[in-house]
Amino acid sequence: MQELVIRRPDDWHLHLRDGGVLRGVIGDTSRHFARAIVMPNLVPPVVTSADAAAYRQRILAAIPAGDRFEPLMTLYLTEGTDPDDVEAGYGSGLVKAVKLYPAGATTNSHSGVRDIAKAMPVLERMAEIGMPLCVHGEVTTPEVDIFDREAVFIETVLDPLRRRLPDLRITMEHVTTKDGVDYIKEHAGNLAGSITTHHLIINRNAILVGGIKPHYYCLPVAKRERHRQALRAAAVSGDVRFFLGTDSAPHVDPLKECACGCAGIYTSVNTMSCLAHVFEEEGALDRLEAFTSLNGPAWYGLPANEETITLRKANEPVRYPAKIETEAGLITVFDPLFPLYWAVA
């Protein structure tokens, strides 16, 4: 049996939701991951440091006994966000980053930014104090094709923002295109990118071929195969600017399996198994630790975890549940469409 020992991983982009869903999903992350950047797009969103402190307490209360897990809190950027509150939250260590959602870009993003100029006082303060900005990198203007949203965002929003505030540390979250990968590679400095598990595995065919597959629908939407290959190359390269952010996003089945289904794929259950498969397929198992456990902490100015986990490759496929039960209902687990042989021991 093949074994791989790596430092305990972190998840640099995670949705935990709240209430019954939070209590149902938190263990799937805390079992294997030491830390996670927790997204603030609740209803209502986490917009102040006080909101973040209260949400953090709800997360801590939901962690299964015996698990050691640290939620890293973020604030939801609005056009009315108070720079002083942001600085105070960051200075206290409570808040690790601010999240920019263009209004309407994804789940619970209607409170997001419509005019980035109105958020400039906060962004200028963040640049001064070295606080990271996590960006959902898509435009939402109706004339832009959904498959082009990321490339247009880079050209019309991200690049001008970086020119105006070159000291602002920006995480381009859930990169989905070759355009995004190339932009990060070509622009040294305060820029890095997270990559999801599922975007390394599926392209847009998974959603559309043979019928609509709602459990492969996410935002940013999966793209063409050439983009998936670019993401794989970046993830397995060892480049310190790329790291894991699963964007694991639980929705109960009725919210996915309907006429207007929610965007999000739930990967927390089997992410490490999927990633071991991908990195083995690419001949890069020796660089899995960098992607999951080293590059992210380095970017966020945190020490790498001292604890380790062991991944073992079995002779027979590992069985994962197709769904998990929560107080709010069933949530479908990501199916990578191939058998998984690696599992955390």
From Swiss-Prot:
Residues that bear N6-carboxylysine: 99
This protein's record includes keyword Metal-binding:
yes
One GO biological process term is: 'de novo' pyrimidine nucleobase biosynthetic process
EC numbers on record? 3.5.2.3
Recorded GO CC terms: cytosol
A Gene Ontology molecular-function term? Answer: dihydroorotase activity
Give, as one word, the top-level EC class: hydrolase
Indicate which residues the UniProt annotation says bind Zn(2+) 1.
Answer: 13, 15, 99, 247
Write out the pathway annotation from the protein's UniProt entry. Answer: Pyrimidine metabolism; UMP biosynthesis via de novo pathway; (S)-dihydroorotate from bicarbonate: step 3/3
Residues binding Zn(2+) 2 are: 99, 136, 174
Q: Which InterPro entries match?
A: Amidohydro-rel, DHOdimr, Dihydroorotase_CS, Metal_Hydrolase
Q: Cofactor binding mode, per the note? A: Binds 2 Zn(2+) ions per subunit.
Q: Which residues form the signal peptide?
A: none
Keywords from UniProt, A to Z, are: Hydrolase, Metal-binding, Pyrimidine biosynthesis, Zinc
What reaction does this enzyme carry out catalytically? (S)-dihydroorotate + H2O = N-carbamoyl-L-aspartate + H(+)
- At the top level, the lineage of the source is Bacteria
Q: Which cofactor does it need?
A: Zn(2+)
Output the NCBIfam families linked to this UniProt entry. pyrC_dimer
Q: Which family does it belong to?
A: Belongs to the metallo-dependent hydrolases superfamily. DHOase family. Class II DHOase subfamily.
The function of this protein is: Catalyzes the reversible cyclization of carbamoyl aspartate to dihydroorotate.
Subunit info here reads: Homodimer.
Name of the protein in its database record? Dihydroorotase
Q: What is the lineage of its organism?
A: Bacteria, Pseudomonadati, Pseudomonadota, Alphaproteobacteria, Hyphomicrobiales
